[in-house]
């Protein structure tokens, strides 16, 4: 017990989205991980649902908080003092927390680690995807492109505020004072393209998942593959079914199980009927526990994404079950797959190549083993804790060099 009290106290900062998402799960998992290892893990959170209850004046004040929030600054400083915080770990800050959290921590002499879940520092809509295609106009031509296309929440006014805030804090070199966690090396390289952040301040640390209780031997699995995700064009669901027509008509014998709902669901049903596909099953929404069990019974998880993705947890969940992943060679998702080792990759725009890739599963026992080995080495809770502590230690050491007493 005495050793646990010596662990650095951490303040986790997060602005919860109106629709719960993967970032919320990551915050909860990291809090539990820290507490399991004896850290005091305090929370400073806001919730975007607060906006719907605000009056006009409060909404104006909260919008200005994208530049600097006095409330955030005061409350975070108070929390650091009251909880004797050694390090502040930030996740999402928009729109209610804002960059003031960084200045509050730095004013208290406490280092800041920012997990980068998306591309918001480079792209106001955070996903590098617009109007049905990948878009990096803001990095190549300037942030004004986002205003033209109303990229933040579909609002020109809100996009203007987001762009002005980003430009202000770039000019103030706010972002150069932080330490960063990116979830993949692909994301790290995108972040460093900003040319404001020292490369030594950016570390790669993926998310983690708990392993399944049992693993089904690859040879004993059902003759099926599974898609788990939103039925949306940017997720590649149309490309997948177009590939499946080729696969099924060429004599392929596997079954495709599709788990999820979304705007393309009606199209999927109509397409299955029109093309008379017999080996495809639409299951609709499937809870995570059932989806993971299904992955563990299947020959592969298919991820035909058409955008860069953030960090698809389904990939790590598949690895934990020794399930290979067939994935488009694109962005963060593609960077997580080692072709022929943990899964198979195909060109993101080629239904023909995806259909051909399915045939590689006939001899994938070694790939199943490679997926499990990769999970055990990189994506367990214990591996994640070691990675996290190395990042925290580096951040606190550099902070101590600037302000020795503040890291005690």
Regions found by a protein language model. Give the residues of each.
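Carbohydrate-associated surface elements
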Residues: 186, 208
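Short hydrophobic beta-strand element within catalytic cores of glycosyltransferases
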Residues: 315, 324-327
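Membrane-proximal helix-turn-helix segments that form the acceptor-binding/catalytic region
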Residues: 107, 135-180
């Amino acid at each position: 017990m005495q050793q646990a009290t010596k662990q650095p106290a951490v303040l986790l900062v997060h602005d919860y989205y109106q629709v719960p998402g993967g970032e919320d799960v990551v915050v909860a998992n990291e809090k539990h991980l820290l507490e399991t290892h004896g850290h005091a893990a305090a929370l400073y959170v806001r919730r975007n649902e607060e906006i719907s209850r605000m009056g006009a004046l409060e909404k104006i004040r909260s919008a200005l908080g994208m530049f600097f929030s006095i409330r955030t600054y005061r409350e975070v400083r108070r929390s650091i003092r009251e909880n004797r915080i050694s390090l502040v770990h930030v996740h999402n800050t928009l729109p209610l927390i804002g960059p003031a959290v960084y200045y509050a921590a730095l004013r208290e002499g406490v280092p800041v680690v920012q997990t980068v879940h998306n591309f918001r520092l480079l792209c106001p809509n955070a996903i590098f995807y617009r109007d049905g295609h990948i878009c990096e106009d803001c990095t190549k031509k300037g942030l004004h492109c986002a205003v033209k296309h109303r990229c933040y929440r579909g609002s020109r006014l809100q996009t203007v505020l987001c762009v002005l805030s980003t430009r202000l804090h770039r000019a103030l070199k706010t972002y150069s004072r932080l330490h960063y966690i990116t979830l993949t090396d692909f994301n790290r390289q995108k972040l460093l393209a900003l040319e404001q952040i020292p490369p030594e301040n950016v570390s790669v640390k993926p998310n983690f998942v708990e392993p399944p209780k049992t693993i089904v031997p690859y040879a004993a699995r059902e003759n099926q593959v599974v898609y788990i995700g939103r039925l949306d064009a940017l997720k590649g669901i149309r490309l997948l079914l177009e590939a499946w027509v080729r696969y099924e008509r060429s004599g392929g014998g596997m079954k495709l199980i599709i788990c999820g709902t979304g705007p393309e669901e009606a199209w999927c049903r109509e397409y299955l009927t029109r093309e008379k596909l017999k080996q495809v099953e639409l299951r609709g929404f499937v809870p995570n526990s059932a989806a993971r069990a299904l992955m563990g019974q299947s020959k592969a998880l298919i991820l035909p994404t058409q955008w860069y993705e953030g960090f698809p947890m389904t990939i790590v969940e598949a690895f934990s079950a020794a399930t290979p992943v067939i994935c488009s060679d694109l962005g963060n998702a593609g960077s997580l797959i080692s072709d022929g080792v943990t899964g198979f990759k195909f060109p993101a725009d080629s239904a023909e190549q995806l259909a051909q890739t399915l045939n590689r599963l006939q001899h994938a026992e070694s790939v199943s083993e490679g997926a499990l080995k990769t999970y055990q080495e990189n994506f367990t809770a214990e591996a994640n804790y070691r990675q996290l502590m190395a990042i925290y230690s580096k951040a606190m050491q550099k902070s101590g060099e600037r302000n020795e007493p503040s890291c005690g």
